[in-house]
Amino acid sequence: MHIERHEIGPRFSEMTVVDVGTGKLVFIAGQVAENTSLDIGGQTREVLGFIDRLLQHVGARREHIVSARVYLASVGDYAQMNAVWDDWVVQGHTPARVTVGAKLINSAYKVEIEATAAFTPKDGHDHAHDDNCEKPHASGDLR
């Protein structure tokens, strides 16, 4: 078994990839919006874009997500967040998901999403060893 960590900080990594033989498990840390002036729909879109970019870096796609955890600063934003989620998620490949109301670390954050994906690399290239993974966002500089 081999473990790769990406965008390593003193407290956490943005993403961890575990090679489990013929496949990989991808653990994405909680992602938050960079542009905190956006409404819940905008912040959700931005966060899901960060997740897409991290998955893409290792050769995975959103349909490989097997589990997601959504944290909302206001449970009143549930319907609006779901509208964006429903447009983004791949039908027929919806992951197990939990959504909870939570006091987020920065009061300007409206949503935080973490995800776990599982996939088998198809192209023979191990993207997890690429060194050009750009940091998708600031993540509150709390790593």
Region locations from a protein language model:
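N-terminal presequence-like segments and the immediate start of the first folded domain
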Residues: 1-66, 72-143
